[in-house]
């Protein structure tokens, strides 16, 4: 993902020797902690008992860019070794693209040379690198007092109630502040797992204390940058901000956010636009919702084709799959948002220097 100041590149494959990330643009002198990074990575493991049986330690091996606990300003390279890999099953289906996966288009794009085991480079395994990049971005945001919190808004047919910002930010539940809804969400995931199926959902993410003036029109649009970044997360199929698609059923008098003055600051009485107007932050909380499709790997029989025999066949997958990837996506969504906001903040500093 390439920003104006910051960028990161993911490398590796799900069943290769390892995966990782190279991050550029992080300023020197930022204090970081191996323990903090590991704690952030632990969140990616999801709800205990409801995630894949594949157990990777996710121990970050810092190759460069960190010295004596501080960023050096040079590229940060982080490696994660793959320790719990079983590729035997994938040899049986290498010519039979799995429905819902990138197997077929990847085979066409890379002329059949791609690593197909466990999804290869398209696997959710690589999101460990996104969370890592997000950790360093969050360290930048800390200096500005910006906080980001993602939670599960919906799993299948179960949706959390409308929550206040205070409820979202102060909740001790790492997955959803609505405890009653969360219990039903867990039941929904367990039901899908028992039936050999999977279930999708929605993650809502909020960023508070974001200063006004970040972004710009067209190419500098921060909303467009966020949406583009969210869509880079595996399994994302929809993104909306503020009221999102609900604005289509309302009138301008209902959607427009009136300006008021509170504690000497200009704010809006409502936040239907989700903190962005004209591609520029308003100073109000940025609110986005991201829709994730159900895990495409399921245990039920599915129709596909045998590309070698060129005939239609039925497959029944074996392996270790998540009944829902939504709980594991929370730190990934936060990481993506943090990276985009940090990039715009650093770019804004360049503007401020030029105008001073």
UniProtKB/Swiss-Prot annotation:
Reduced FMN (FMNH(2)). The keyword NADP applies. Keywords: Amino-acid biosynthesis, Aromatic amino acid biosynthesis, FAD, Flavoprotein, FMN, Lyase, NADP. Transmembrane segments: none annotated. It comes from the Archaea. NADP(+) binds at residue 44. It catalyses: 5-O-(1-carboxyvinyl)-3-phosphoshikimate = chorismate + phosphate. One of its GO terms (molecular function) is chorismate synthase activity. Pfam families: Chorismate_synt. Pathway: Metabolic intermediate biosynthesis; chorismate biosynthesis; chorismate from D-erythrose 4-phosphate and phosphoenolpyruvate: step 7/7. This is Chorismate synthase. It comes from Pyrococcus abyssi (strain GE5 / Orsay). The lineage of its organism: Archaea, Methanobacteriati, Methanobacteriota, Thermococci, Thermococcales.
